[in-house]
Amino acid sequence: MLKTVLMPSPSKCSLMAKRDQDWSPNQLRLDILDQNARDADPRGTGFDYAEEFQELDLDAVKADLEELMTSSQDWWPADYGHYGPLFIRMAWHSAGTYRTTDGRGGASGGRQRFAPLNSWPDNANLDKARRLLWPIKKKYGRKLSWADLIVLAGNHAIESMGLKTFGWAGGREDAFEPDEAVDWGPEDEMEAHQSERRTDDGELKEPLGAAVMGLIYVDPEGPNGNPDPLASAENIRESFGRMAMNDEETAALIAGGHTFGKVHGADDPEENLGDVPEDAPIEQMGLGWENDYGSGKAGDTITSGIEGPWTQAPIEWDNGYIDNLLDYEWEPEKGPGGAWQWTPTDEALANTVPDAHDPSEKQTPMMLTTDIALKRDPDYREVMERFQENPMEFGINFARAWYKLIHRDMGPPERFLGPDAPDEEMIWQDPVPDVDHDLIGDEEVAELKTDILETDLTVSQLVKTAWASASTYRDSDKRGGANGARIRLEPQKNWEVNEPAQLETVLATLEEIQAEFNSARTDDTRVSLADLIVLGGNAAVEQAAADAGYDVTVPFEPGRTDATPEQTDVDSFEALKPRADGFRNYARDDVDVPAEELLVDRADLLDLTPEEMTVLVGGLRSLGATYQDSDLGVFTDEPGTLTNDFFEVVLGMDTEWEPVSESKDVFEGYDRETGEQTWAASRVDLIFGSHSRLRAIAEVYGADGAEAELVDDFVDAWHKVMRLDRFDLE
C-alpha cells in the first residue's frame, strides 16, 4: 500500500533567492555571455553529435514516425486518426521563430521545449505533440536530438500525407536551457497589443519578427483582433519578410500548411484552459493548458479559440485550400470559441468535411483572417491564382519554401547531416566556392606576412579590415564571417561601419599582393583574398605585440575562398549590417539602445565569453582600431602597440569622467590634479570600469605584470573570431 507523505505547500515559502538583476534592474546583463562560457550539456564536452548521428538509421526513424502518426492515443486522440497536422504545426512553430535581423530563434537547439516558447499561447497543446514523440526520442537517445526530431516529424508528416518534400538535413544540436539573449519584445503579458513593439512609423522594431508577443507571426483574427484582411496582409508581409520569405514563399507556406488539419476552439480558451506548462501544477508533469470543457480533448479540444478545418480532406495534400479560398466568398463571424473566423456564404460548402473524431458528424470549412488576406491582397492573390492553375508548381514551391523554413538557421551545407539533404546549392545558404588549388604552407604564410607589413598599411587598417570581415559572423544562424571575402562585395563594402574609402585602399593593396603571389607560383599553390585579409590582421597583431616586447604567432588555417557576386544575395546580407559594433566604438545615429548593451549583444553573436569580450575591446583600443580612427577609448600614447594601457586608464583614479551631453553617449576624461582633458570615451569604454563583473575581469589585465597575459589572451580570442565560420575544419 502506498504511503502518502505530506510536504510543505509551495505557496508557503520559497528558498529561491532574488537574482542580482531583480535588485538592480538596470544592471548590464552578462548572463547571455555566460551561456557561451559554460557547457550545460549533461553529456559533457566530449560528446560529438555529428558522430552519433552518423550511426542513426534514418529510415527506421521515419518508419517509427509513420507508425506513431497513424496510431491514435487515448490520452490525446489524433484528429482524423493522423498526428501529421499536429507535427507539422510543431515543426513550423519551432523553426518559425527565426528572424533575419539577428539570426536568433529557429529550430536549432530544440528550444521549443523551454520557457518562454513552451508556454506561448501560439504553442498551446504542442506540449502533447512533443510528449507523443518521447518514445521515439527515448529509443534513439543521443543519436537523434530533440531539435532534429521535432523538425523531422513535421517533414515526414508532409510526406505521409501525400507530398514529396525537397529534403531534410540533420545536424541541429540540442540546447539544455533557454537562450537568454533573445529579445522577444517589450511586453509584460502575452498577446498584448501595444505600440512599444513598433516604431513611430508603425514598423516592427529591430530585431523583432512577430507582430504580437507570444505568437509565431501575426494575430490569426487580424491586427489587434480585428478581422481586417488587408491590414493582416501588411502584417504577414512584414513578419514573413523578417524571416527572409518573399511573397511567393509566404503564400506557398500558408496555403501549404493550411492544406492540413484544423484549428481548435470548441469553447472560449479564457474560460476553460488552465495554466501554461511553466506555471502548471507539478502533478501535470510538464503539461499545460488543462481543459475543463467536456472531455478536454478530441472534439472538445481548445487551442486558439478558432474552430474548424480548411479543406474537405484535412490529411491529404491537394489544392482544396486554394480552391475553397478563391472559389467561394467568405464572411466574418464569431466562432464557438469567441474568436473571429470566416465562414462561407455559399451553402454548397456546408457540412462537407468529416468530423475529426465522430464519423457520424460533418463540419463546414472555415478560414482565418490571415487566409482571407491572401485573397484580398492583390500581390498575394496573383500568386494564389497561379498556384490554383498549376497545382504542381504549388507543390514544388511549398516544398522548397518549407525546406528553407526548417533549415534557415543551420548555416552552410557543410553542417548538414544525413542522406536526405539535397545537393542543390541555394543562395540563401550563402555558398562559397570549393577550394580548387593547393593551400599555402608555413613558408608562404611567412612570406605573405612580410609582404603585407612592408606596405604602407597601418596596424590599425589591417586589424580593422580583418575584424570587419570576420565579425559579421553570427553564431545564432551561422551566417557571415571571413570565408568568402564578401567584405569586397555589395553590400558590405559600402557599409558605413567599414569606412568604405579606407577599406577600398586596404583591399586594393591586398589584392595586388594576392595577384603578384599567385602569378609568380609555378605550382598549384594559391592564396585567396579571404585568407589574405585574415592573414593581414594576424600580421598586424603580431607586429603590435612585438612592438610591446612580446614574440607571438597568431594561429592561421588557410582554406577560405572568395565568393562571387552571383553567390551573394545583397538584400539578405543587409541583415548582417551591425546597428553598432562596440569593438570598433561604432554606433548608428538612429540607435536608441545603450551602447554597452549592443556590445554584449554583438559579443553573444560572436559566441564570446565575458572574458573574451573584455580582452578584445581592450586590445583593439590599444591597436587604435576604432571607427574613423576616433580617439574614443584609445587610452594610450602608443596606438598600434598591444599593451594594457586601456585597462590601466579605465581602472585608475587619475581621471574624472564627465558626459559631453545629456544623452551620456560620449565622455571626456580630465586629470584630477591639473583639470586638463586627457582622454575621451564611449559608454562601451567606461563600462569596464563601472560594471562590477567587467571591472573584476579588467583588473586581471590592468595589473602590473599582466601585459603578457593580455597579449596571449587577446591572440586566442582574436584567432577564435577569425575562424568562427570555418565549419570545414570541424
Swiss-Prot record:
The gene is katG1. Its EC number is 1.11.1.21. It comes from Haloarcula marismortui (strain ATCC 43049 / DSM 3752 / JCM 8966 / VKM B-1809). This is Catalase-peroxidase 1. There is a cross-link at residues 217-243 (Tryptophyl-tyrosyl-methioninium (Tyr-Met) (with W-92)). CDD domains: catalase_peroxidase_1, catalase_peroxidase_2. Keywords: Heme, Hydrogen peroxide, Iron, Metal-binding, Oxidoreductase, Peroxidase. It comes from the Archaea. PANTHER family: CATALASE-PEROXIDASE, HYDROPEROXIDASE I, BIFUNCTIONAL CATALASE-PEROXIDASE. One of its GO terms (cellular component) is cytosol. Bifunctional enzyme with both catalase and broad-spectrum peroxidase activity.
